[in-house]
Amino acid sequence: GILSTFKGLAKGVAKDLAGNLLDKFKCKITGC
């Protein structure tokens, strides 16, 4: 239903945000 769709969207957004933060963090450590 709509709730599970919303949950899936939220998960995807959280994943993207976490990925972006990880990339920035890696860049600080390894210099990209």
Swiss-Prot record:
InterPro entries named among the record's database cross-references: Antimicrobial_frog_2
Keyword match Secreted: yes
Subcellular location per the Swiss-Prot or TrEMBL entry: Secreted
Record keywords, A-Z: Amphibian defense peptide, Antibiotic, Antimicrobial, Cytolysis, Disulfide bond, Hemolysis, Secreted
Xref: Pfam families: Antimicrobial_2 (PF08023)
Stated family: Belongs to the frog skin active peptide (FSAP) family. Ranatuerin subfamily.
S-S pairs: C27-C32
Native organism: Rana boylii (Foothill yellow-legged frog)
Top-level taxon of the source organism: Eukaryota
Tissue specificity field: Expressed by the skin glands.
Annotated protein name in UniProt: Ranatuerin-2BYa
Coiled-coil positions: none
GO terms of biological process kind: defense response to bacterium; killing of cells of another organism
Function: Antibacterial activity against Gram-positive bacterium S.aureus and Gram-negative bacterium E.coli. Weak hemolytic activity.
Record lineage: Eukaryota, Metazoa, Chordata, Craniata, Vertebrata
